[in-house]
Amino acid sequence: MSHRKFSAPRHGSLGFLPRKRSSRHRGKVKSFPKDDPSKPVHLTAFLGYKAGMTHIVREVDRPGSKVNKKEVVEAVTIVETPPMVVVGIVGYVETPRGLRTFKTVFAEHISDECKRRFYKNWHKSKKKAFTKYCKKWQDDTGKKQLEKDFNSMKKYCQVIRIIAHTQMRLLPLRQKKAHLMEIQVNGGTVAEKLDWARERLEQQVPVNQVFGQDEMIDVIGVTKGKGYKGVTSRWHTKKLPRKTHRGLRKVACIGAWHPARVAFSVARAGQKGYHHRTEINKKIYKIGQGYLIKDGKLIKNNASTDYDLSDKSINPLGGFVHYGEVTNDFIMLKGCVVGTKKRVLTLRKSLLVQTKRRALEKIDLKFIDTTSKFGHGRFQTMEEKKAFMGPLKKDRIAKEEGA
């Protein structure tokens, strides 16, 4: 038989070539939302860290649909988003060949976790980054120069972006080096943007000032790495029949005799995962507050709802597996997102104008699951577990030893 008697589309997309390891660990924003001067000044992106997944119960609000007013169970991802610190302002001018940086101004005080980003080995370095630059803010000549820079930015720039970094010390991670990124400022005139950014130099910006409840956002990140994989796993090609000589997880024909080369479009073994990807339209189900102290008491009930009044935090019993406890502000997104736990994710405002009913649907959570994610969790809170288990032997022994 000289040819197959049927045709089939190729396996795997060529739109994501080359399938190699990403050169950057933090997701890069390749385009920011279009600016609208009629809106108030706001940021367009934020950085967060993937903590893990859980599930929720909510009531669907979709009049006319069969599922309207019915309860549904949905998977959600928790992304921890501690406030970001603004440390710089960048002005861009539009040229025939695209945007060009015009001026960059850094803040007077920059924390060590941000300075670490400018060194390969912080321990062995002199730690002198920005020491000369920061003196500009102290003498008269430097202050005049900075004022001149700000005025020229107001005059010539069309795009204003801030430089902001994450606060690693607030997270349950070993890493001390902060992630640094430029975030575009949209809304208002250039002068208003610059004044807004200047007011917030060295200040913290919380996530609830960037995103809102029920908003659709895009998540940019690097996927979970899988290492070197064969064609069946990497391209999802069909397995060959059982009796095939020299293996069946292969491609039977890798091309014609001539041209005497293998085409780039033929599925081959190689790197799978750790690719840079942008996923659009992830709905925010909840923007949660971190732990806070009120009247001398630690308040943790950020997973309570109007229907589930139990005093519980978003953390499952034992914490999120391979992450730890979420103690800062967090965002709850519908479904899954790219990357492993602890992976830094870039959250960006949607580039599209959302008009679909599903995108504009109001989310009313009834219940957030906080059972242990390590094994078959049964209990929502520690109190519930203690009430069911009764006094344990180890507790009795500890009590006797104490007495």
From Swiss-Prot:
Biased-composition ranges, Basic residues, are 18-31
List residues of cross-link (Glycyl lysine isopeptide (Lys-Gly) (interchain with G-Cter in SUMO1)): K294
State its location(s): Nucleus, Nucleolus; Cytoplasm
GO cellular component, as recorded: cytoplasm; cytosolic large ribosomal subunit; cytosolic ribosome; nucleolus; protein-containing complex; ribosome; synapse
Q: Where is this region: Disordered?
A: 1-37
Q: Which residues carry the post-translational modification Phosphoserine, per the record?
A: S13, S304
Superkingdom assignment? Eukaryota
Q: Which GO terms describe its molecular function?
A: 5S rRNA binding; RNA binding; structural constituent of ribosome
* Glycyl lysine isopeptide (Lys-Gly) (interchain with G-Cter in SUMO2) crosslink site(s): K39, K224, K226, K286, K366, K386, K393, K399
Q: List the disulfide bonds.
A: none
An example GO BP is: translation
Residues annotated as carrying N6-acetyllysine in the record are K136, K286, K294, K366, K373
Q: Which Pfam families does the record cross-reference, listed alphabetically? A: Ribosomal_L3
What SUPFAM superfamilies does its record include?
A: Translation proteins
Q: Does the keyword Nucleus apply?
A: yes
Query: Which of UniProt's keywords are assigned here?
Result: Acetylation, Cytoplasm, Isopeptide bond, Methylation, Nucleus, Phosphoprotein, Ribonucleoprotein, Ribosomal protein, Ubl conjugation
Show the InterPro entries listed in the entry: L3_arc_euk, Ribosomal_L3_dom_3_arc_sf, Ribosomal_uL3, Ribosomal_uL3_CS, Transl_B-barrel_sf
**Known post-translational modifications?**
Constitutively monomethylated at His-245 by METTL18. Methylation at His-245 regulates translation elongation by slowing ribosome traversal on tyrosine codons: slower elongation provides enough time for proper folding of synthesized proteins and prevents cellular aggregation of tyrosine-rich proteins. It is not required for incorporation of RPL3 into ribosomes.
In-chain residues carrying the UniProt-annotated modification Tele-methylhistidine: H245
Q: How does it assemble?
A: Component of the large ribosomal subunit. Interacts with DHX33.
Q: Which family does it belong to?
A: Belongs to the universal ribosomal protein uL3 family.
General function of this protein: Component of the large ribosomal subunit. The ribosome is a large ribonucleoprotein complex responsible for the synthesis of proteins in the cell.
Q: What protein name applies here?
A: Large ribosomal subunit protein uL3
Q: Which gene encodes it?
A: Rpl3
